[in-house]
Design a protein with these regions (language model features):
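A short, surface-exposed beta-strand/turn
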Residues: 175-189
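Aliphatic-rich helix starts adjacent to a transmembrane/signal segment
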Residues: 2-5, 15-54
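A generic secondary-structure signal for well-formed alpha-helical elements
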Residues: 22, 31, 35, 59-70, ...
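C-terminal globular interaction/adhesion domains in large, modular proteins
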Residues: 71-163, 170-174, 189-633
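Long amphipathic alpha-helical scaffold segments
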Residues: 166-169, 181-183
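Membrane-proximal N-terminal amphipathic helix
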Residues: 40-72, 218
Length: 633
């Protein structure tokens, strides 16, 4: 019995030992399998990542080619243009004996970009041909996350699809393929859909009570604060639309220099040159829908359609000392290609020795104009030269009618502190000629006076009797300052209108040249309405006058973008339009001040919503380009 029990015990032990060995072997096998599988998965993941990086890199290359083409074409481009540009494609060096190539079996010899027919979005367009540009549609401006990139803004969007498919054979003869695509968009954004667009810092330092509706954007810093003019926290500044900024937002009472360390080196942080300054006080404007809903930090809008740094070689006057005077600043938009303003003497200098880039040439108001009037003077003799371009034709009698609408006078500009020789253009006298069907006028008039002898001899253009404008729209451009006297574009239905100038000053219906040099009490304004877009220069805060070397104070802000010279007390300046600041003034560089210069009007300002679908002739557009997320296919 003892022997039997012993044998049974030994047998049980053997069985247990065998079971343990079996389990151990099984575990080892499982571990080997898991390790092998994990290694294969790691290899596969690494291989996949390599292929994905190559594919996404190829698409980034294609995107760079696309950006170059749209920026040099200044608009959407055809499939053929892109295909020709993508003949040379990036190649990928072998890594660890593994080569990555384009998947020829799927039709890819490199990355591809094709225009998207918007029919897939529910709009009926015909098939795209190789040489046709993709169609455009009006869209809100969104970023690649689907969020509104510039809240409230609309653009004309042209979409493309960039795609590539790549293949590679890795160790173990494993073939891996990867396809990726993304949408890319070229969107033109009319600038005349904003109440105000500033290329530089936009300031509104505690203005008299005012409400600004519509969109407001600055490519610089937005410095806005409310309060009654000159001090106190009364009054109000209200934005009813969206305000967007690029480099910063500030709502203190020291809008420009308070956070500027350079300024602090030469100024006291507890004093300021603005009347009523209160150190470290903040008076934020009113935002009816809430700050978070109305104020947005955004990326730049390019007002020239491309990156300005690629075509403009210098900062605005007084620093435009580059060898090529045809690329000094965005002020080129209001200058003819053969003149420039000397930043020291203010003389309009004629020259044909500087080249014009296509990007600038296409945007000059002078180049767009159908009728051009040049004023020159020798002694007491004034000569008017009228020429046509862009399809316009004028008879000798019509040219005479236009010159008869011009007259010479002089007035004192209290802000400039000097007499100004003014050429007045009587629109009522010129209207029948500008409206004549035989003239084939495109609605853009360019007029300039190049006879200034220097800083103390400024010349300007004045628009008078402009309540009725040419029926198909009217844009006036000049490299001189422009005065708008009296009601403008107010008779009957408003027409799309714009004024491009070195500076724009509003003179009321009550203005008299004979009182221009008198005290402020002799320059009483009355209610006046102006309906036009304004594109002009500005004198920024802390600007250094290159002639006097004086450092200026506050710019006067957005509320003084159109300038004033009268006592507007209890009178209203009604304005409907769009205000665009792109450059520093080169001629009208007098320092902003109230005092004896003017007393502010009641401001009833609003955006002209007609501009959205019917902008003025020669309108400007900004451009944004964007990319969607990578999508595997």
């Amino acid at each position: 019995m003892r022997i039997l029990n012993k044998l049974q015990a030994e047998a049980s032990a053997l069985v247990i030992t065998m079971i343990v060995i079996f389990i151990a072997v099984a575990c080892i096998g499982t571990a080997v399998h898991v390790t092998t599988t994990t290694a294969r998965q790691t290899d596969s993941s690494r291989d996949f990542s390599t292929l994905r990086s190559a594919a996404e890199g190829a698409l980034d290359f294609a995107y760079g080619i696309w950006v170059e083409k749209v920026n040099t074409t200044f608009g959407p481009v055809s499939n053929k243009t892109l295909n020709d540009a993508l003949v040379t494609v990036p190649s990928f060096a072998a890594t660890n004996g593994v080569s990555v190539s384009y998947d020829a079996s799927a039709g890819y010899s490199g990355p591809q970009i094709t225009g998207i027919d918007l029919a897939q979005y529910g709009q009926a367009y015909g098939p795209l041909t190789a040489n046709s540009n993709p169609p455009s549609t009006k869209v809100p401006l969104i970023d690649n996350t689907g969020r509104n990139k510039f809240p409230g803004w609309l653009g004309m969007n042209t979409s493309y699809l960039a795609s590539v498919k790549m293949s590679a054979t890795f160790l173990g003869n494993r073939t891996v393929k990867y396809g990726v695509k993304r949408a890319i968009n070229y969107t033109t954004v009319p600038l005349f859909q904003a109440t105000a667009f500033f290329e530089d810092d936009m300031e509104l330092y505690r203005p008299a009570p005012m409400t600004i509706d519509g969109l407001v954007h600055t490519n610089g810093k937005a410095s806005v604060s409310q309060g009654s003019a000159g001090g106190g926290s009364g009054g109000g500044l209200t934005f009813t639309g969206n305000l967007s900024y690029v480099t910063g937002y500030l709502d203190s009472t020291a809008p420009y220099p308070a956070d500027d360390p350079v300024w602090r080196q030469t100024h006291s942080p507890t004093t300021d040159w603005w009347s009523g300054y209160v150190a470290n006080a903040a008076f934020p404007p009113n935002y009816p829908a809430g700050f978070d809903q109305q104020v947005t930090e955004v990326t730049r809008m390019e007002p020239l359609g491309v990156d300005a740094a690629t075509i403009l070689s210098a900062t605005p006057p007084p620093y435009n000392i580059t060898t090529n005077h045809n690329s000094d600043s965005a002020r080129e938009l209001i200058e003819p290609p053969n003149t420039y303003v000397d930043p020291i003497t203010h003389v309009i200098t004629s020259t044909n020795s500087f080249p014009d880039t296509q990007a600038i040439a296409d945007r000059r108001v002078y180049n767009k104009a159908g009728i051009r009037i040049r004023i020159s003077k020798t002694g007491t003799t004034t000569t008017y030269t009228v020429t046509t371009a862009n399809g316009a034709t004028l008879t000798a009698a019509q040219k005479t009618a236009l010159t008869n609408a011009l007259s010479q006078t002089s007035m004192y500009d209290r802000r400039e502190a000097t007499n100004v020789d003014v050429t007045s253009f009587d629109l009522s006298a010129a209207l029948s000629t500008l409206n004549a069907s035989t003239a084939k006028f495109n609605g853009i008039l360019y007029i300039d006076d190049i006879s200034s002898t220097g800083y103390a001899d400024p010349k300007a253009i004045r628009l008078v009797n402009g309540s009725t404008l040419p029926s198909n729209g009217f844009t006036v451009g000049s490299e001189n300052p422009i005065y708008i006297q009296g009601d403008y574009n107010t008779s009957g239905a408003r027409v799309p209108s714009a004024v491009f100038a070195d500076a724009v000053t509003i003179l009321s219906n009550a203005w008299k040249d004979s009182n221009s040099s008198g005290a402020l009490s002799a320059r009483n304004a009355n209610d006046t309405t102006v309906n036009t877009a304004i594109v002009c220069g500005f004198v920024p805060s802390e600007w250094v006058n290159p002639v006097t070397h004086e450092t200026y104070g506050y710019s006067g802000g957005l509320n003084n973008f159109p300038r004033f010279l009268e006592d507007w007390s209890s009178n209203t300046f009604t304005y409907k339009g769009s205000m665009i600041e792109l450059f520093a003034s080169g001629i009208a560089t007098g320092q902003w001040d109230t005092g004896s210069v003017y007393h502010p009007p009641n401001r009833a300002w609003s955006f002209d919503s007609n501009f959205i679908d019917n902008p003025p002739p020669g309108s400007l557009t900004a451009v944004t380009v964007s990319r969607g997320a990578f999508v595997r296919f």
